[in-house]
A protein has these predicted regions:
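Conserved glycine-rich acetyl-CoA-binding loop
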Residues: 68, 88-106, 125-132, 136-137
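Acetyl-CoA-dependent GNAT
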Residues: 5-11, 16-94, 105-111, 115, ...
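Short coil/turn segments at alpha/beta junctions that flank glycine-rich nucleotide-binding fingerprints
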Residues: 98, 115-118
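Accessory recognition modules or surfaces
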Residues: 102, 154-163
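Conserved catalytic-core motifs of GNAT/GCN5-like acyltransferases
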Residues: 121-125, 135, 140-158
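Extreme N-terminal starter segment of soluble prokaryotic enzymes
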Residues: 1-3
Length: 164
């Protein structure tokens, strides 16, 4: 099990991992049309490349013991004052429940401590089973939000926080 820093050569891999994760995890939560809309807008080459050009935004590829990619994370330091935002953490279906998510969250915590940020925030769909994982890792719900993301779709999320 390991994590490696992603770079522009990994954009296609990140897109494939996102597609695999979203298409298996979200159909019971949001319409398939919304999944495809969000994948297209949030995981375009330009979107990921712009993140990678931001020195405070980091992507890591999550690998299993055979060094095969099973997921990724994306987080941004200084998203707000004293705050790191965990934007993305996704695993392939077969990687869920094997500690990869916890390891990735610990990496974000370690990186956040090195910046002297005092908290990590994330948004999670209110019906996403990952909510329990975040809670088990010390995150607490601090708010809820319904975001209009265009094309008639919304994200109905909890905002969660981890404080150091």
């Amino acid at each position: 099990m390991g994590l490696r820093k992603a770079d522009e050569k990994d954009i296609t891999l990140i897109q494939k991992l996102a597609q695999s994760s979203w298409r298996s995890a979200y159909p019971s939560i949001i319409p398939v049309e919304q999944i495809e809309y969000m994948l297209k807008s949030m995981y375009s080459d330009d979107e990921i490349c712009n993140h990678m050009k931001n020195s405070d935004f980091h992507y890591f590829i999550i690998e299993n013991n055979k060094q095969e990619p099973v997921g990724f994370i994306g987080f941004e330091h200084y998203f707000e004052a004293d705050t790191t935002k965990l934007h993305r953490i996704y695993l392939t279906q077969d990687a869920i429940g094997h500690g990869f998510g916890k390891e990735a969250i610990n990496l974000v915590k370690d990186h956040t401590l090195s910046t002297l940020n005092k908290r990590i925030v994330l948004n999670v769909n209110k019906y996403n089973p990952a909510l329990k994982v975040y809670q088990s890792q010390g995150f607490h719900i601090i708010d809820e939000i319904v975001l209009d993301i265009g094309n008639g779709y919304v994200m109905d999320d909890y905002i969660m926080e981890y404080i150091f």
